[in-house]
Amino acid sequence: MQQIYKIIFLSFNQDFFYKTIKILINIILIVIFILLSSCNFLTDKKAFFLNKEFSQKEKEFKRLKEKKEYLKKHTIHKHIFSYGNTISIFLKKSGVKINDILKLIKIDKNLNNITIGQKIVCKVDNLGNLIKLKWYISKFQKKIYKRYKNTFKFIKYTYDSFLEKKSIYIKKNSNFFKSAYQSGLNKSEINSVIKAIEWQINFNKLHIGSKFNVIFLNQKTKNKKILLGVKLDNLDRKYFSIRAFNGKFYDSDGFNKSEELINFSFLKKYRISSPFNLRRVNPVTHRISRHLGIDLAMPQGTPVIATSSGKIIKAQFNKIAGFYISLKNKNYYTTRYMHLKKILVKVGQKIKKGEKIALSGNTGRTTGPHLHYEIWINHRAINPIKAEYILSTQLTKSERIKYLKESKNILSKLK
């Protein structure tokens, strides 16, 4: 019996042992599974945050790249200056920030002196930042301004090509044209020399042995030469004619004594009954309308004098202007004469300044006898009272100082 109990006890202990071992193994497996699951969760969580951080950095990088690309985009604005334009007005219309305009002008105040016919080209980004500006002072001079951080730097003031000097000697049994041709000048170059200095000398009275020194800008890319200066030695007298920034020629002291383009003395003889006004109340219609000229009170039949030389392009009747004349000058401007009694010229006829072209009257839409007079420059009406300054060949005091400074280079090469 005791033996039987022993066997049963051993069997029970063996089953208990195995069950215990099995339970422990299961517990260990469960713990391992939990630990592994926890590691995977942490890894996944870490990966999630890493991916999120990378995604944010990628988005930020993409945003900065797009911003950079956006800033790279720019607009080019070009403009040829006419009466009434300023650098500030042009840059504002081009979308340039006010601060940039002020900084640019502070660097070079001469930008406020841009004259009619000069060209400006500017590059502006999408945020209104001025990137670059070119000022074409003349056919042979330009200034370049470039953005540098938050300000601007003056880059260059240059001749585009190279200078070419030639000498012309007046020989016996010859004249200027023949001598210049023998010196290698073509017809166009010879004519440019004549126009540059004819207001100082008489080409028919040049003496044998007289010598011309001329300097041209040789534009390689355009296969063209531009006259910059002329010097003449004639009977121990020296004459100079240097091209200025406005394209006109002046002597070594900055003066040009050539004849004025428009004879304003005729206009000054009569009272202005109605001035130039872009918002005038019309005395006939009683509506606000542009008055693009001046009215000169004068009796009917008063001789109307051509204030400039040129060609008649219109001589006809209009129900508002009455009998009127348009006279075009080769130097880019036109003068108009309205409400005439009688026209004394024909279309196509060439007229000299001071020549009688009509009789004043009271035709068209008027309230009384007068002459309506207009001046147009580059297809734009200007105030005739201010035109005397605009069309003047003379330099202002500040322009003359600028000319004397800039002409030194050409003068030194002519001597």
From Swiss-Prot:
Belongs to the peptidase M23B family. It is found in: Cell membrane. Its EC number is 3.4.24.-. GO terms for molecular function: metal ion binding; metalloendopeptidase activity. The keyword Metal-binding applies. InterPro entries: Cell_wall_metabolism_enzyme, Csd3_N2, Dup_hybrid_motif, LysM_dom, Peptidase_M23. GO terms for biological process: proteolysis. The chain crosses the membrane at residues 23-43. Residues 77-122 form the LysM domain. It is an enzyme of class 3 (hydrolase). GO terms for cellular component: plasma membrane. This is Uncharacterized metalloprotease BUsg_310. It is a single-pass membrane protein. Its cofactor is Zn(2+). Keywords: Cell membrane, Hydrolase, Membrane, Metal-binding, Metalloprotease, Protease, Transmembrane, Transmembrane helix, Zinc. Pfam families: Csd3_N2 (PF19425), Peptidase_M23 (PF01551). Gene3D superfamilies: 3.10.450.350, Glucose Permease (Domain IIA). Zn(2+) binds at residue 291.
